């Protein structure tokens, strides 16, 4: 099989080589023919150029002769004119001489005059005869005739030469046209020759490649022949060894009668050896076939991949051309629209001046960061909105009572501020400058606050936490609201009684409480504020509050000074920063947005100027803390 395939390949290669050689010979013959035609055209061109040069020489000779004749004619004309001028001068001189002679003869006698006159009569006749002889001499007439004949002949020659010149010029133009045609044909022939040379070079390359492939195939053939010979020799050696082994086995069998099992094993061994050799030969053939297939498949895959890449590139090119055309159209449309808009703008600027800009909107009210943080914590503890709806449904009545209590508490606070309660001074030097912070998520703010609370928990002693006991598990806000509710129910009949009881209950009594218990209570209130799932009952119809204005506010905590913790609410919009001090004995009271707006402006002014806030101490009997209003932060 291999030998037949190799012979077929060799036949194909030889046929291709013969075809390439035949094409090469045909192209060579065509090249020779084109060279012969080119040589003929060159010879014709050279002959035409020679004829042109001869015509040019003849025309130059004729022009020189004509110029010589014209010069000779001009010389003869000048000679004749000079002769005529001399004749006129002589006539004038003769006349003057006659006049002079007549004057002299008048002086002489009449006899002499008559004689003289006779002599003179004879003389003018002789003079006229001499003049006639001079004028009518044969030589002059001959010369004049010759000159006239020469002039006529020269003119005729001139006409003939002019005609010849015109004919030569026409011939020259025709020859030039022929030369141009020959040049064009030569250029065409040169281009054809170049093309044929390129084809010849391609054929040479193809023939070189074919020869190289033929040589490679010859080398492979020789190698395969050598390998086949080696394989045959190896097979012969193996066959000889196998025969030797068979003989030895027969001798052994004859010498010692073995068992039937040994005979069967030997037979099986021989069969297995034959099968192994056959399988080895088949395996080698399969390996060769697979290698050839792999080579062919690799080439086909490369060609297929290249074709696919070509198609993809062509598609990309078309898409890019379409995009380019569309972008050009868009650019034109945009230019047109820009021009129209510029025209409109120019017309509007020229026609009517622009109206004044509207006034800027009023700045929003300052946000309440503590309220926003509380709403954030509420959202974190209650992510779903179903629980808030249930709470709103279950507690619509208590919200109205709480709002009334809040209003009463605000009025009480305002009365105390107006009466002039002594306020604690606040250290304003430790106040940090307001810096614009970027908007952070609710989770990061809550994590920071919880970390601060953790540090506060670590700083305080464990005794203060144990001394509080299980009574502090309830939040301070719930206690205050419960107490206010009881007082409101007890004294609902008279508003003065409500005010008195609420004032007596909410008014702090100055007592001696240890600083440890104060700090512990303050910590517990802070933890209750930030960790309570629902510290404030929302107003009906309000829904969960959102965190607004976090970018313009910042909450900072200060370490305890003189037994209390201070918290600052710094706003980047306000230059004078309001300070809220959370003391261990201060009371926390809830407020709504409307109540915060109804506050007295004097309190806001005092807080902006940096004055201290009222300090409310815990009652010794109850041990409860209040809440300061922090809506102005």
UniProtKB/Swiss-Prot annotation:
Looking at the record's lineage, which domain of life comes first?
Eukaryota
Region of interest (Disordered), residue spans: 343-508, 525-633
Reported effect, residue 101 to A: Inhibits F-actin retrograde flow at the peripheral region of growth cones
Residue positions, PTM N-acetylmethionine: 1
Q: Which residues form a coiled coil?
A: 7-353
Protein family membership: Belongs to the shootin family.
Q: What remark about domains does the record contain? A: The N-terminus region is necessary for interaction with actin retrograde filament flow and accumulation in neuronal growth cones.
Descriptive protein name: Shootin-1
Give the source species. Rattus norvegicus (Rat)
């Amino acid at each position: 099989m291999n030998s037949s395939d190799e012979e077929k390949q060799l036949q194909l290669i030889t046929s291709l080589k013969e075809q390439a050689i035949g094409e090469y010979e045909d192209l060579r013959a065509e090249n020779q023919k084109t060279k012969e035609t080119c040589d003929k055209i060159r010879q014709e061109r050279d002959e035409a150029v020679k004829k042109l040069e001869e015509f040019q020489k003849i025309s130059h000779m004729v022009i020189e002769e004509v110029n010589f004749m014209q010069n000779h004619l001009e010389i003869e004309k000048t000679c004749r004119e000079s002769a005529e001028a001399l004749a006129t001068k002589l006539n004038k001189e003769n006349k003057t001489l006659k006049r002079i002679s007549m004057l002299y003869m008048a002086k002489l006698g009449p006899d002499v005059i008559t004689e003289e006159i006779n002599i003179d009569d004879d003389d003018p006749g002789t003079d006229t005869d001499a003049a006639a002889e001079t004028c009518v001499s044969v030589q002059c007439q001959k010369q004049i005739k010759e000159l006239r004949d020469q002039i006529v002949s020269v003119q005729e020659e001139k006409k003939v030469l002019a005609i010849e010149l015109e004919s030569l010029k026409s011939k020259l133009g025709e020859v030039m046209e022929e030369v141009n045609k020959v040049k064009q044909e030569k250029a065409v022939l040169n281009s054809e020759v170049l093309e044929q040379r390129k084809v010849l070079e391609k054929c040479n390359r193809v023939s070189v490649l074919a020869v190289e492939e033929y040589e490679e195939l010859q080398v492979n053939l020789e190698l395969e022949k050598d390998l086949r010979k080696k394989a045959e020799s190896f097979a012969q050696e193996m066959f000889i060894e196998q025969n030797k082994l068979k003989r030895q086995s027969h001798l052994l069998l004859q010498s010692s009668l073995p068992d039937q099992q040994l005979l069967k094993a030997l037979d099986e061994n021989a069969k297995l050896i034959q099968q192994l050799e056959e399988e080895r030969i088949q395996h080698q053939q399969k390996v060769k076939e697979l290698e050839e297939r792999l080579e062919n498949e690799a080439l086909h895959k490369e060609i297929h991949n290249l074709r696919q890449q070509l198609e993809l590139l062509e598609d990309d090119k078309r898409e890019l051309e379409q995009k380019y055309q569309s972008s050009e159209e868009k650019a034109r449309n945009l230019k047109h629209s820009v021009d129209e808009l510029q025209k409109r703008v120019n017309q509007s600027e020229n026609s009517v001046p622009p109206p004044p800009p509207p006034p800027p909107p009023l700045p929003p009210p300052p946000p309440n960061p503590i309220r926003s943080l509380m709403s954030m914590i509420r959202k974190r503890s209650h992510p779903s909105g179903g629980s808030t709806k249930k709470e709103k449904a279950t507690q619509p009545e208590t919200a109205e009572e709480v709002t009334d209590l809040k209003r009463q508490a605000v009025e009480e606070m305002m009365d105390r501020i107006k009466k002039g309660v002594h306020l604690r001074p606040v250290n304003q030097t430790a106040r940090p400058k307001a810096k614009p912070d970027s908007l952070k998520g609710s989770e990061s703010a809550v994590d920071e606050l919880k970390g601060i609370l953790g540090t506060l928990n670590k700083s305080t002693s464990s005794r203060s936490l144990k001394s509080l006991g299980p009574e502090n598990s309830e939040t301070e806000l719930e206690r205050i609201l419960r107490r206010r509710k009881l007082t409101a129910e007890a004294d609902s009949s008279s508003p003065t009684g409500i005010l008195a009881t609420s004032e007596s209950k909410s008014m702090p009594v100055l007592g001696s409480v240890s600083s440890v218990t104060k700090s512990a209570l303050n910590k517990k209130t802070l933890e209750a504020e930030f960790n309570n799932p629902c510290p404030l009952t929302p107003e009906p119809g309000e829904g969960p509050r959102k965190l607004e204005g976090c970018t313009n506010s910042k909450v900072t905590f200060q370490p305890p000074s003189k037994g209390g913790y201070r918290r600052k609410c710094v706003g980047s919009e306000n230059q004078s920063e309001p300070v809220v001090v959370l003391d261990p004995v201060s009371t926390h009271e809830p407020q709504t947005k409307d109540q915060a707006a109804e506050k007295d402006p004097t309190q806001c002014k005092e807080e902006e100027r940096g004055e201290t806030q009222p300090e409310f101490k815990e009652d010794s009997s109850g041990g409860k803390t209040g809440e300061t209003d922090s809506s102005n932060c």
